[in-house]
């Protein structure tokens, strides 16, 4: 008994250490377990008492390791130890999932993903609340403060954050605005910050803000202008197929892939171990280094073998060689450029690429309408422009282009497009098409020029046949263009990952030139004006007749005497004058009717009145109280200017002298 008292404190720990022996006793056959000694019964009772005390003193985790159930016959079947069959059954059907070690690996991964997802959601909510708090405290600086800040070196991080804040405010202006600030204030601050961040002048930044009212899209466009486009090449179908060229270049150490689904000759170069412009394939004329945007106007032109084609601004010859490849070196192709030094580049590229149906010209584009009017089936005009679509190639465009430069380009483009259309043959069996393109995104150089052509010539816009691109503008701020301009295509670097570009395809309807305003519009205006004139004339006649009737009835009272109306007096004086001055009015007879006849009558009537005034005048003109001799009235010669030029100045002087003598 004394030994039992000593072990009373460590009974729970002893039960845990004797766990394997108890487990073996549970698994023994029934024959062995039936023989239970009294000592073992006493030991079980003591273990129960110690377990109760341990349950009161120790944590719950240690108590769960030993569970005793009373009222068992043998005293051992009520014991449930870890690893027993009863515990396995309890774990399988229990809702208690505190034991994480029993989960399958896929369940553990799923739980980890759920925790990670909850963490991300919580972080996003915290960030959202933080942004809302920052937006609530955002204060818009004045333009003067920003200008003072720009005088020194600006902190680009602060400027970038302010741009983001202003764009967010403009996106939800009603709820986030400062009541004391207008939208113009926010836009002005945004414009100043964008100019400071990206290095543009005010004019270009204003144009881009008009093109992209959405602030997020504007930032994407500005970022794309600072990043170069992928290097692309065009396979020369006159010498090699694109598939064979790609294999050869891959063997050279170049990583190339087909550029896009809409082109069959384009390849994009991701990286290269050799210079792209110095491979044997390049020197042999198997490909041309060319941007994907320059493939679009040639695809829209769609030249056919045997056509007469003009590339009005062709340097350095990429589009010209592409046209020759589509024509299969047949027909006649004129490659023109106004710059003589650039014509040398055209000749070199055409020789290298194997083009032999081309005539290289060095003329101004405006001269072709005089040299070969109606002489081409198809014309490509890639007009000189401001280059706002390829800013990544020339960063000086950001500051060098202003309103005057764009206006000069606009005027030149209008002259070139008129000359190009006049050089087209509208009666060509499969031609009469003009493709106008620029590497600019400004409306003044694109839609405005094409709309000008539609108003001046017999032509119409047709679909370009290109599967990609954004439709052109029909309404842009103060501009209102022809609805068919929606068939033109625009390309942006941040949308299509190519240089900014514009393509329009025009069909010539007639070789006859329209008037300045346009024949169709002029006829409509004439009809409208004619109907309006008739209406006004009818209203005037009705009002005059009503006035005459009132004057006839009422007359005019002067000094209490009723006199005839003014119009009646004029008619009476006119009739009296006609009767008395038959000799003076004799030359006015049988002149005829019409505007010229009326003019002659008026001139002759004035001359007769002057003659009558000379007869009645005493020859003096009173100025104040002094009489001055009045010069005799000199009459101009009745001889027209052209007749006077034929007869000479002497005959005119003689006639004037004779007329003065007759008057005296």
UniProtKB/Swiss-Prot annotation:
GO terms for biological process: cuticle development; gonad morphogenesis; maturation of LSU-rRNA; negative regulation of cellular response to heat; negative regulation of locomotion involved in locomotory behavior; positive regulation of egg-laying behavior; positive regulation of fertilization; positive regulation of multicellular organism growth. Disruption phenotype: RNAi-mediated knockdown in L1 larvae results in sterility. RNAi-mediated knockdown in adults results in reduced egg-laying. RNAi-mediated knockdown from day 0 of adulthood or in the germline does not affect lifespan. RNAi-mediated knockdown in somatic tissues reduces lifespan by 10% and reduces body length and results in morphological defects in the gonad leading to the production of no oocytes. RNAi-mediated knockdown increases resistance to heat stress and increases the speed of locomotion. It catalyses: a cytidine in 26S rRNA + S-adenosyl-L-methionine = a 5-methylcytidine in 26S rRNA + S-adenosyl-L-homocysteine + H(+). CDD domains: AdoMet_MTases. Residues 84-99, 541-550 have a biased composition (Acidic residues). Its EC number is 2.1.1.-. Residues 53-68, 519-528, 606-618 have a biased composition (Basic and acidic residues). Pfam families: Methyltr_RsmB-F. It is an enzyme of class 2 (transferase). S-adenosyl-L-methionine binds at residues 313-319, 337, 382. It comes from the Eukaryota. The active site is at residue 439. Keywords: Methyltransferase, Nucleus, Ribosome biogenesis, RNA-binding, rRNA processing, S-adenosyl-L-methionine, Transferase. This is 26S rRNA (cytosine-C(5))-methyltransferase nsun-1.
């Amino acid at each position: 008994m004394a030994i039992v008292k000593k072990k009373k404190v460590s009974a729970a720990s002893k039960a845990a250490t004797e766990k394997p022996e108890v487990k073996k006793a549970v698994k023994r056959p029934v024959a062995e377990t039936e023989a239970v000694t009294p000592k073992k019964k006493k030991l079980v009772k003591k273990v129960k008492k110690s377990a109760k005390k341990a349950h009161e003193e120790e944590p719950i985790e240690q108590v769960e390791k030993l569970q005793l159930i009373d009222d068992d016959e043998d005293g051992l079947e009520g014991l449930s130890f870890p690893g027993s069959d009863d515990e396995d059954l309890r774990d399988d059907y229990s809702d208690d999932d505190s034991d994480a070690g029993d989960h399958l690996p896929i369940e553990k991964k799923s739980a980890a993903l759920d925790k990670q997802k909850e963490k991300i959601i919580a972080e996003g909510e915290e960030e959202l609340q933080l942004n809302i708090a920052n937006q609530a405290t955002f204060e818009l600086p004045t333009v003067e403060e920003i200008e003072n800040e720009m005088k020194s070196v600006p902190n680009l991080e602060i400027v970038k954050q302010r741009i983001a804040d202003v764009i967010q405010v403009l996106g939800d202006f009603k709820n986030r605005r400062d009541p004391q600030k207008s939208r113009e204030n926010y836009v002005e601050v945004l414009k100043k910050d964008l100019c400071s961040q990206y290095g543009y002048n005010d004019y270009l930044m204003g144009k881009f803000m008009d093109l992209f009212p959405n602030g997020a899209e504007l930032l994407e466009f500005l970022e794309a202008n600072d990043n170069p486009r992928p290097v692309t090449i065009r396979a020369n179908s006159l010498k090699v197929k694109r598939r064979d060229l790609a294999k050869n270049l891959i063997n050279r150490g170049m990583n190339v892939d087909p550029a896009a689904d809409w082109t069959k000759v384009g390849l994009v170069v991701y990286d290269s171990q050799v210079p792209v412009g110095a491979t044997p394939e390049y020197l042999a004329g198997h490909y041309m280094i060319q941007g994907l945007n320059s493939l679009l106007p040639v695809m829209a032109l769609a030249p056919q073998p045997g056509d007469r084609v003009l590339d009005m601004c062709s340097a350095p010859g990429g589009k010209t060689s592409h046209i020759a490849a589509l024509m299969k070196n047949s027909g006649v192709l004129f490659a023109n450029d106004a710059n003589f030094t650039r014509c040398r580049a055209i000749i070199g590229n055409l020789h290298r690429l194997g083009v032999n149906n081309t005539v290289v010209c060095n003329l101004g584009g405006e001269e072709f309408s005089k040299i070969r009017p109606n002489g081409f089936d198809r014309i490509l005009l890639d007009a000189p422009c401001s280059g706002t679509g390829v800013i990544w190639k020339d960063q000086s465009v950001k500051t060098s282009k202003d309103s005057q430069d764009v206006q000069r380009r606009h005027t030149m483009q209008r002259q070139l497009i008129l000359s190009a259309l006049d050089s087209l043959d509208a009666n060509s069996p499969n031609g009469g098409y003009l493709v106008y393109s620029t590497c600019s995104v400004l409306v003044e150089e694109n839609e405005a020029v094409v709309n000008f052509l539609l108003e001046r010539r017999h032509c119409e816009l047709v679909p370009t046949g290109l599967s990609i691109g954004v439709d052109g503008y029909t309404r842009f701020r103060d501009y209102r263009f022809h609805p068919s301009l929606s068939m033109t295509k625009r390309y942006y670097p941040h949308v299509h990952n190519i240089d900014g570009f514009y393509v329009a395809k025009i069909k010539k309807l007639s070789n006859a030139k329209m008037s300045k305003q346009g024949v169709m519009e002029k006829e409509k205006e004439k009809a409208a004006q004619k109907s309006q004139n008739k209406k006004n004339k009818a209203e005037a006649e009705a009002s005059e007749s009503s006035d005459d009737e009132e004057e006839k009835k009422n007359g005019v009272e002067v000094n209490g005497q009723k006199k005839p109306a003014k119009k009646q007096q004029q008619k009476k004086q006119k009739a009296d004058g006609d009767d008395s001055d038959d000799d003076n009015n004799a030359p006015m007879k049988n002149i005829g009717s019409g505007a010229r006849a009326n003019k002659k009558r008026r001139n002759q009537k004035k001359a007769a009145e002057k003659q009558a005034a000379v007869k009645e005048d005493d020859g003096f003109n009173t100025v104040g109280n002094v009489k001055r001799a009045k010069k005799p009235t000199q009459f101009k010669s009745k001889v027209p200017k052209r007749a006077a030029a034929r007869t000479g100045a002497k005959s005119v002087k003689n006639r004037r002298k004779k007329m003065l003598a007759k008057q005296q």
